[in-house]
């Protein structure tokens, strides 16, 4: 029987086949006529891609049926290798939450009066409750940079 194969260019070629022929055989005949290797050929009939091991009868391809030939697409981009790191990831520092931590800034004296142990920053932009750091020779505000230096008694 005779079937037609329509190529991408619109050219139609005729092939002499039997209904018992496999799709592999049909692709080999197309290679003889067109020079396209069978591994690059995809044959479509009635919207379905024809698989190599099956016969024309499996797909109900009869005389004077038209198959559509499309070329197989090349694969996608080259697969990238997963990056391997030599050093382990640095563990992020976790701040410890200490309950009642504010108690270290205050002291209750013998009379029951609450005293501040640290000096509060007088600058308006820092706001109330901003304590200055106690250094051996000065008080320092980390927020605004205000510094008070202790007077040294008995200048040497």
UniProtKB/Swiss-Prot annotation:
GO annotations of cellular component type: cytoplasm; nucleus; ribonucleoprotein complex; ribosome
Zinc finger extent (C4-type): 121-144
Protein name, per record: Ubiquitin-ribosomal protein eS31 fusion protein
Disulfide bonds: none
Species for this entry: Solanum lycopersicum
InterPro entries xrefs: Ribosomal_eS31, Ribosomal_eS31_euk-type_sf, Ribosomal_zn-bd, Ubiquitin-like_dom, Ubiquitin-like_domsf, Ubiquitin_CS, Ubiquitin_dom, Ubiquitin_ubiquitin-like
Taxonomic superkingdom: Eukaryota
Pfam families documented for this protein: Ribosomal_S27 (PF01599), ubiquitin (PF00240)
Domain Ubiquitin-like, first and last residues per copy: 1-76
Similarity field: In the N-terminal section; belongs to the ubiquitin family. In the C-terminal section; belongs to the eukaryotic ribosomal protein eS31 family.
Gene3D superfamilies: 6.20.50.150, Phosphatidylinositol 3-kinase Catalytic Subunit, Chain A, domain 1
Miscellaneous notes: Ubiquitin is generally synthesized as a polyubiquitin precursor with tandem head to tail repeats. Often, there are one to three additional amino acids after the last repeat, removed in the mature protein. Alternatively, ubiquitin extension protein is synthesized as a single copy of ubiquitin fused to a ribosomal protein (either eL40 or eS31) or to an ubiquitin-related protein (either RUB1 or RUB2). Following translation, extension protein is cleaved from ubiquitin.
GO biological process, one term: modification-dependent protein catabolic process
